[in-house]
Amino acid sequence: LKEGDAVDDFMKPDRVVVGVESEKAKIIMERLYKPFMMNNYRLIFTDIPSAEMIKYAANSMLATRISFMNDIANLCELVGADVNMVRKGIGADSRIGSKFLYPGCGYGGSCFPKDVKALIKTAEKSGYSMRVLKAVEEVNESQKSILFEKLLKHYNGDLKDKQIALWGLAFKPETDDMREAPSLVLIDKLIEAGANIKAYDPIAMDECKRRIGDRIAYATDMYDAVLDADALLLVTEWKEFRMPSWSILGKTMKDCVVLDGRNIYNGEELRGMDFIYYKIG
């Protein structure tokens, strides 16, 4: 069940995996899920260890795709390739598909980080090393700092007293969950570098205040966040951030620098309006 879509996911699941120990348990669970599973092939029965492994392996596979694409995006930037075209090209391959191929500033939340760690720890207890998943974790932790690194490079290593606007605090849209959110890493690094931060998120403001208190300023809306800002960092791709009024930003920002952590903006369009634009890849 995805945060923000749990009810819909329950009513219309892709598949339901059930671990059972007896035929009686299977019959009971089959009867329970039948109204929601008109296509019986989406109801999968297996033993309990396999059911647990399916859950952890599925989320770890998705996390792997994200970290892989972030690695590819960073390489694209170095060799002059367009990561969006690369994403479309490999996503058009029916063996791969287009989902979870979007580069960004790292994944967070309660599921992906936890499940990747769980498989790594389970393997260690069994005397095995999950080398791929360890790399997935390493790439993701590094990726959470990528907007900071780009900003630091833009200002030649000096962010002291820079006014930085953050759009998005939650780890993804449609939730206030900030567990393992990239915004937390960004905030820590920006404060350590001496920058001032003003942040806005449609619903995660209270959660952010609970977590970090008054270490940053909190905006009343997305445009208040960018008032007199030296740079804007897009961290969470909320719908309301997708089509801002760039004319307002151009008039209210001190220095029109935009760092797009989710690659949702048109760089050519922004550069045509005299913005300095950075994306992932």
Question: Can you annotate each of these PLM segments?
Answer:
Residues 1-281:
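Structural/interface elements that position substrates and couple domains in central-metabolism enzymes
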